[in-house]
Amino acid sequence: VVKFPYMDNYNYHKGMNGIIQELTGLLKTKNIGTDSDRALLLDFQATLETKPEKAIKLEKDALAQIETITADNARLVSNLHANLGGLYRMNGHPDLAREHMEKSISLLDQFNLLHINDSIPQIANYAMFLTEQQEPERGISELQKLSGIIKEYHSDDCLDYAKVQETLGTIYLMTANLPQAKTHFKRAFKIYEKIWADEPEMI
């Protein structure tokens, strides 16, 4: 979601609604914009929608805009599946949540996008979902795989690596494995301390 830090919550929604109205008007003309633009617009609308059923419908409509998945739109389609999976998860539909979360991650894998920032919340959310579904080992395995990819493409002292370590710590804590939880939390906070040495309030 696009962030507008200068808007408070009310004005943020008001501002986003204004932007969406402008874009909706523009994209009504078929020769303006692409299928991806239309999908993104529906995704924005789903983000602002307060009624779960309507938000789910908007995300499904967004996915329906894109007939063929290519290297150019794979990241967007993966995000749409992740968002739809998240909505299903929050609204008590675990089977549909799993289906879309797994599709989201398989697209990242298929198009060699597992190392990008988008993969971190998607895989972290999937791992937490698996833990809720009494499958913490699978969740841990997904996060360990992601840790290896981040280390290979970036490093093991970057913010992305720390976020994954913190999620691992959270899952171990949820499953009452305190020694492992402590190990991963320590790794995460060591990185946070280094990155935010000049901004301790961020830790």
Predicted regions and their residues:
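Fold-core signature of tandem repeat domains
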Residues: 62, 84, 97-107, 161-162, ...
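Residues that mark the junctions of alpha-helical repeat units in TPR/alpha-solenoid scaffolds
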Residues: 31, 36-38, 70, 77, ...
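Conserved alpha-helical positions within TPR/SEL1-like repeat arrays
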Residues: 5-8, 37-50, 75-90, 117-132, ...
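TPR-repeat structural position
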Residues: 13-17, 52, 94, 136, ...
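Amphipathic alpha-helical segments of tetratricopeptide repeats
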Residues: 24-28, 63-68, 105-112, 144-152, ...
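Amphipathic alpha-helices of TPR/Sel1-like and other helical repeat/solenoid scaffolds
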Residues: 9-31, 55-66, 146
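Short coil/turn linking the two alpha-helices of tandem helical-hairpin repeats
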Residues: 4-9, 31, 46-49, 53, ...
